[in-house]
Amino acid sequence: MSEVKVFEVRGTFRMGDEPRQPFTRQVPATSEEEALEKVYSDLGSEHGVSRMEIQIEEIREIDPSKVEDPILRRLLGVEE
C-alpha cells in the first residue's frame, strides 16, 4: 500500500460569465494524479464546473505540518 502524502493544488476555474475564480486546495493522496482527480471531482461537485473550465497552475507535495485544515490535520495525526 502506498504512503499517503499531502498535495497543494492551485489554479483557477470559470463560473458562468464571472471572471476566473482562484482556488487553493490541500488534499491527501498517494500521487499527484490522484490529488488532481480529487480536485476535479470536488470542484465539479461543489460548483458544477467541468474539467475543461478548471485550469491547474501548480501542484506540489507539502509537509503535513503545513496543512491548514484542522480536520485534515487530525486525520494525518499532526499535533496542534
Swiss-Prot record:
Signal sequence extent: none
UniProt keyword rRNA-binding, yes or no: yes
Origin superkingdom: Archaea
Keyword field: Ribonucleoprotein, Ribosomal protein, RNA-binding, rRNA-binding
GO MF, one example: structural constituent of ribosome
Pfam families: Ribosomal_L18A
Biological process annotations from GO: translation
SUPFAM superfamilies: RplX-like (SSF160374)
GO cellular component, one term: ribosome
Transmembrane segments: none
Presence of keyword Ribosomal protein: yes
Quaternary data: Part of the 50S ribosomal subunit. Binds 23S rRNA.
Family under the similarity heading: Belongs to the eukaryotic ribosomal protein eL20 family.
Protein name: Large ribosomal subunit protein eL20
Gene that produces this protein: rpl18a
